[in-house]
């Protein structure tokens, strides 16, 4: 069965990466929840997608330029006054559930990795005793490798941008993943075909999809039987999977 990951806690249903979205996700029949982790200036780990505060909070400027004391006073838009969450707080929301936490290790502007950030995230999961409940993902292959080196065993996925897939070709993507001992690729849903799924699996790698946010994309990835996909509409994905599953 293809697993469903509630992307940013269901970003088209509730305010993304918020307590509201995560608590609602715990009530859904999903296997995974996806969220994003940035560092603060004082090395706290906060759950927010963008590297700046402007889009999703009432603050402005880079996330990593402020201490947690300042960030904790900001309000997430659409939440009725809730603040952003620390990684440890999100872990505690999902700890009592069977849902796997899928963390994307974010970068600074221009996709420049934060020094030591991936390793800090991995060690935080290890200290919280949830390594076996987590999957680390990144669009930067080196970032994935840094996290895995810091905490083993660690499930991990390389998210491949369409431009990377086009520029270097699928064979080189697979070779790079194999060379880095990365067991799974995540490709954008519009870059996936039955042939590509077969080639990736024949190479001994798992295959997932992302940006599956409408009925057509969800149906496509369910038909391709990928291992997992992320979606901003987990409710829709759950319903479609149930309808397509033989009884």
Whereabouts are the PLM-identified features?
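Phosphate-group recognition and catalysis centered on beta-loop-alpha active-site segments
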Residues: 1-247
């Amino acid at each position: 069965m293809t697993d469903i990951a509630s992307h940013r806690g269901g970003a088209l249903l509730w305010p993304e990466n918020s307590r509201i979205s995560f608590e609602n996700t715990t009530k859904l029949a999903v296997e995974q929840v996806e969220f994003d982790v940035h560092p603060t200036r004082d090395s706290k780990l906060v759950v927010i997608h963008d590297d700046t505060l402007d889009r999703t909070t009432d603050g402005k400027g880079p996330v990593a330029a402020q201490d947690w004391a300042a960030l904790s006073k900001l309000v997430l838009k659409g939440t009725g006054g809730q603040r952003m969450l620390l990684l440890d707080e999100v872990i505690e929301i999902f700890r009592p559930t069977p849902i796997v936490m899928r963390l994307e290790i974010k970068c600074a502007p221009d996709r420049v990795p934060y020094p030591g950030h991936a390793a800090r995230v991995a060690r935080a999961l290890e200290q919280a005793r949830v390594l076996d409940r987590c999957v680390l993902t990144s669009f930067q292959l080196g970032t994935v490798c840094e996290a895995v080196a810091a905490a083993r065993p660690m499930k991990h996925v390389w998210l491949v941008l369409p431009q990377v897939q086009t520029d270097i070709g699928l064979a080189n993507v697979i070779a790079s993943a194999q060379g880095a001992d990365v067991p799974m690729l995540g490709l954008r849903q519009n870059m996936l075909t039955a042939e590509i799924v077969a080639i990736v699996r024949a190479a001994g790698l798992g295959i997932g999809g992302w940006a599956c946010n409408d009925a057509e994309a969800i149906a496509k990835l369910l038909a391709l039987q990928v291992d997992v996909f992320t979606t901003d509409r987990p409710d829709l994905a759950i319903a479609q999977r149930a309808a397509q599953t033989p009884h």
